[in-house]
Structure formats: C-alpha cells, structure tokens
Amino acid sequence: MIKKEQSLVKMLLPHIIAVVAFLFITMAYFSPMLQGKVLSQHDVTQYQGSAKEISDYYYNEGKTSAWTGSMFSGMPAYQIGVHGGSPNFLDYLEAPVKALGNTTAGPVFAGMLMAYILFCLMGFSPAVAILGAVAYSLSSYNIVILNAGHVTKAWALAYIPLIVAGFMSLFKNKVLLGSVLVGLGLALQIKSNHLQVTYYTGLLSVILFITYAVEVLSKKNYKSFLM
C-alpha cells in the first residue's frame, strides 16, 4: 500500500510543480495587481458602457432583458451581457482560475494549464511541457489583446490546446479521454463567447484530421482510420 502511495506521489509531483510554477510566473508577471493597480483596457470600458442599460434594468427591476438599445439601433443582449440565470458546472470549474483576475491573470494561467495538458499528451517531459506552456500563454499576442481588453478572445484562445489535445487523443483511439477533453474544451470555449476563435479552432481541427488521415492512409492502416 505504501509503495502504491509513493508511486502515485512520484507520478503526480511533476504536475503539481508545474501548476505551482504557472501560478508563480503568472502572479509575478501581473504583480502590479497586488499593489492595487488596474490595467486600462479600452474594450472593457467600452463593454461597460454598452452593457449599462442591461445592468441598470436588471438591478432596478430584478429581471433580465434580452434586448438593448445601447448598441447600434438595438440588438440582442446575449452578445453583450446577460444578467441572472443559474450557474452551471462550467462556472464552478472556472471560478478558481477567474479568481486570479477575470480580465488579466486568469486567461494567462488557464492557457498555461491547457497547453501543459496538450504537451504532456503529446509525449513531452513535464519540464519541456512547462516551457512550451509558458511560451504559448505568454506569447506577445496574448499580452497585446489583454492590454486592449479583448478578454473573451483571450479566454477562447486559452482553451484551444485542450480541444487539440482531445482530438489528438481521439486520433490515437483513446475515445473516452478524447471525447471528454474535446467536449469540455469546446464547452468552455463557446462559453467564452468569442465565435471567431471557435471558428478558427474548427478550421485547425479539420487540418489536424486531414493530416492524420493522410498519415494513416499512406501506411494503409485502414482499420485504425475507420475505428
């Protein structure tokens, strides 16, 4: 029994170290937040203005409006900000990460976690997976869009590696693991509400499938492809 516990600890220890490292790197990068400083994000300010009518109606009337006149000549509110409703399990799943900062550190930390899962499933060592995950999430584009306030895009980008990891698992005939990762990653990404990134993720998935199909069929492994 003791040997099994020691083996489990030995297996989990690199991943625990990875999570702690991601947390340290993220909070070090966003350390000005700990001093009470706030990042000026244009799109967030613009969102607050466009959603004010919906927010005022909800807090004054206690009801959710499905329409707002604050954008263009009026448009559905679900693309801006809908209040009320019961949280689902995805909200609880994201809560610890969003506690780091929904519009700042949260998506960066999430991106590191998702990319780490992808690189580990690709067969890289934990050390290499950590480096790859940090490089993915701290890429200059992610920082630029956060500075501009493109928060929903940052969250959607953070979940791409999880979806890719799921498809790669499916290609390796790991049906249960692949289905869970694709389903969870896609649900979280759609919840982020940035359909442009979801569309690009779909294109990436198609390219991955074609690449896999060509590789398998070139080896005449038809049974594996059909399975």
List where the protein language model places each region.
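Transmembrane helix-loop junctions in multipass membrane proteins, especially transporters and channels
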Residues: 30, 34-38, 173, 194, ...
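Membrane-embedded helix bundles of polyisoprenyl
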Residues: 22, 112-121, 127-215, 227
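Short helical patches
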Residues: 5, 9, 93, 210-213, ...
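Start-transfer (signal-anchor) and selected internal transmembrane alpha helices
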Residues: 1-29, 223-227
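Membrane-interface coil-to-helix junctions
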Residues: 25-115, 134-158
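Transmembrane signal-anchor hairpin modules in multi-pass inner-membrane enzymes, especially those
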Residues: 1-4, 8-13, 42-46, 50, ...
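Juxtamembrane/interface motifs at transmembrane-helix termini
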Residues: 87-89, 165, 218-221
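Membrane-interface starts of transmembrane alpha-helices
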Residues: 13-17, 95-103, 124-132, 178
